[in-house]
């Protein structure tokens, strides 16, 4: 059902203008930039996309624009997760209407929901997605929901679930999931362990830094398929040097600043309460943008 979703999927950023409104022109440029750099698909409206500081209407607009801009050229996964099941269902129905290939939802957070309530939440979204496969999104560090291996096994075997986005540094658990579910599409979620995640059993990844250097991650996939561990390690090291800087600057605003210097995003701002990049990092981010543009050619 979801085997065609394997690959390198950029977790799409959402550009805003100086007034904090959705910047549709920059969003369209960013989609095209990702297509041109050779990624396999886009994961739209997730953590990287600042979904939880947007209205439901804005999230639907983003889905519609991305679908219009891609025109079936790449795979599209719509993150529709909200704390509210009803709102998640509304977004899932919109994703189906706009022609997305799959939906995804983070575990409902903030309130201490029972595991059965989590399962019911996913069942309802799957029903509203009307046949689109579900990508369960496990990100305990941000959601605060720490699923056990048995609970993950239960979620990924719900009817309609086709994939898991495993944003966790627990590579042992990644391997356990792969061993238990050989046909499950399994995404590595932390960019800094992409190569390790693939070796632990992931089919590909969904990541924020793919927006600026997706070709490097494709290079890691290619190297590992060819048994070239040395090249994969070298590429991962180069990716991690970038990630080291982005962690200092704030990842999303740092990425937007790099894309601003690449003439992709007009305004390098995230939505408040996120603040701007500290000016002391701007020279490093500008140099990084120039380096990546030269490398990409």
UniProtKB/Swiss-Prot annotation:
Record field: catalytic activity = aceneuramate = aldehydo-N-acetyl-D-mannosamine + pyruvate
What GO molecular function annotations does the UniProt record carry, in alphabetical order? N-acetylneuraminate lyase activity
Q: Which residues form the active site?
A: 137, 165
Xref: SMART domains? DHDPS
| Keyword Transmembrane helix on entry | no
Similarity remark = Belongs to the DapA family. NanA subfamily.
Its protein name is N-acetylneuraminate lyase
Gene name tied to this protein:
nanA
């Amino acid at each position: 059902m979801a085997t065609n979703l394997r690959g390198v999927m950029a977790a799409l950023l959402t550009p805003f203008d100086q007034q904090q409104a959705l910047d549709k022109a920059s969003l369209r440029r960013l989609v095209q930039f990702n297509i041109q750099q050779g990624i396999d698909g886009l994961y739209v409206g997730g953590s990287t996309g600042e979904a939880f500081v947007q209205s439901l209407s804005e999230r639907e607009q983003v889905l519609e624009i991305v679908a219009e801009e891609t025109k079936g050229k790449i795979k599209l996964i719509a993150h529709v997760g909200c704390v509210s099941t009803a709102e998640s269902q509304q977004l899932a129905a919109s994703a189906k209407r706009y022609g997305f290939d799959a939906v995804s939802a983070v575990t409902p957070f903030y309130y201490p929901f029972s595991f059965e309530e989590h399962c019911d939440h996913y069942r309802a979204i799957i029903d509203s997605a009307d046949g689109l496969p579900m990508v369960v999104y496990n990100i305990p560090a941000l959601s605060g929901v720490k699923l056990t291996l048995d609970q993950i096994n239960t979620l990924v075997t719900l009817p309609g679930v086709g994939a898991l986005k495993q944003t966790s540094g627990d590579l042992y658990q990644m391997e356990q999931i792969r061993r238990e579910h050989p046909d499950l599409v399994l995404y590595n979620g932390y960019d800094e362990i992409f190569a390790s995640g693939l070796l632990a059993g992931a089919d590909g990844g969904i990541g924020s830094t793919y927006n600026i250097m997706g070709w490097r991650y494709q290079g890691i996939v290619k190297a590992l398929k060819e048994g070239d561990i040395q090249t994969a390690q070298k590429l991962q090291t180069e990716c991690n040097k970038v990630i080291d800087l982005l962690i200092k600057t704030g990842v999303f605003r740092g990425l937007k600043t790099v894309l601003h210097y690449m003439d992709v995003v007009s305004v390098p701002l995230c939505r408040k309460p996120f603040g701007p990049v500290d000016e002391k990092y701007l020279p490093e981010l500008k140099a990084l943008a120039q380096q990546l543009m030269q490398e990409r050619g």
